Amino acid sequence: MISEQTIDNNVEQGIASYVDYLNNIRLADLMNTLESILSNETDKLSDLASKSANALSNLDWAKIEINNLIDSNRGGDTGVHGFISEFAETGIRNARVVYQGLQKSVVLLNDNGPADILLQGKEVQMKFYANILEEIKQASNYDKMSMLFPRDHVEVIEKIMSGAKTVEFNGNVLSGSQINNIRKAIEDESALRGVSYDKWLESSVLKYKD
């Protein structure tokens, strides 16, 4: 019998593989790649009936919806990436929690409203820009809800807000002015909202390039 710990590790590895593949493949190959990942996970989790099936169903749902996005080219060549990130975020987060026997933590709204997802009941707007400062500047347009940025961007922000003087981003060391601009933008947004940044900023399970 496969141990619970072994299966748990397999699930985490499968999810990590899912994220890695999103980073490296062309849109045209996305369907086949996700199918391969999910088939592999199905084999690994064959001994866990309920939780495994629920976890895999969330990844399978994301795969189907992402394939539909590609087929319809929703949002065009650039906008489709934003929609893909919403479905990927939802599928991965929910797969993780239902495997632990918990309720789904994310609801994808998909209704063209200001909020993209509900994260543990909170309205959240997702922004995946190459430029961290531009993401932060968008936050003022959604002052009634939380913001969700790529995981690697949030890590940079956390380092800056903790007082780090040397911060790397995309393999480059940020200049003093870049660090100060990001810090000031976060402080200004927090002042407008009346709460610290960790109360309105959420980290994605995905990095920007994912």
What would you call each of these model-derived segments?
Residues K44, K51, K63, K104, ...:
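Context-gated lysine
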